[in-house]
Amino acid sequence: MLKKNLMLFMSICLVLVLAACGNANNSSSASEGSTKDTSNAAQDTHSASGEQRIASMSIHLTNDLLSLGITPVGSVIGGEAKAFLSHVADRLQNTTPLGPVKDPDMEALLALKPDVIYLDEEFSGDDIAKFEKIAPVHVFNLDDGTWRDHLKDIGKLVNREKEAEQYIQDYAAETEEVKSLIHDTIGDGTVMAIRVTAKELRVFSTRRPMGPILYEDLGLTPAKGIKDFDSSKPYQVISREVLPDFDADAIFVVVNSDDEAQSMFKELQNNPIWQGLKAVKAGHVYPIGAQPWLDYSSIGNKMAMDEAKEMFSKK
């Protein structure tokens, strides 16, 4: 009798131990799953609560969201700007500004109580933990792939994959039309894009933001020497004296809006070096705005393409 009771007691203990181990393993797995990939947490939030309250810590991700018809509850304002970028400001009237991308307003972000936070790895990659204390995060490497890839990724997260694909198709169709218009104007000529600031003259490389839309989407041929630029940098600073070396048939020009930059461009225009450029003498100089042309996002590229279409339709 004693032996049977002892065996029964040991069996009960064994069952309890196994049950405890099972619960511990399940708890460990759940913990690992929630910290290993915070994008999964973001997807779970979406499925449980419908449309998410998204906070975007990247102007480019904000604009990708806008392309899909989604307005983030909060967004950084980007760069040195003191407000949302002009070409999208009217679409962000109900969005809380979260400060510049390099120094976001964490208190304002916390007060928003977002369901999920979108981060740009370049600016927030070292601070993921502090954002995770507020909400699940999804980190994007904007140097990995193109804006199309980023738009598709966001489309998956917000259940708007069809809308993302349609946006890309519409952009491709318009691009083909603009290609034809530009070719009718400059033929197979070479192209360069420059930016005039208060202190320097820059030539854009093949890298984003300017390179992809000119040399990939529109298939234009870079002027001499541009392919030799450091492809990890968006531009190279030059002196006006070397402008003739590029021998460009057409020049796209971005001039900063401040008075100093405007004065510097006027001075450049009056310089014999500028006046002697092939593109200038042929009338193939095209002024463009910093926004949307330097906004490497789905909405930025679409608006830039719209401007190019209008500009070259008049030629």
What positions do the PLM features span?
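Short, low-complexity, disordered segments immediately C-terminal to signal peptides
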Residues: 9, 22-47
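C-terminal motif of bacterial Sec signal peptides marking the signal peptidase cleavage site
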Residues: 17-20
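A short, structured surface patch at a secondary-structure boundary
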Residues: 59-108
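Extracytoplasmic ligand-binding site segments that recognize negatively charged/polar headgroups
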Residues: 84, 142-154, 189-213, 229-230, ...
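Proline-aspartate-enriched helix->loop->beta-strand connector
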Residues: 113-118, 136, 243, 247-251
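Extracytoplasmic substrate-binding proteins
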Residues: 130, 134-199, 284, 295, ...
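Structured C-terminal subdomain patch of bacterial secreted/periplasmic proteins
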Residues: 249-315
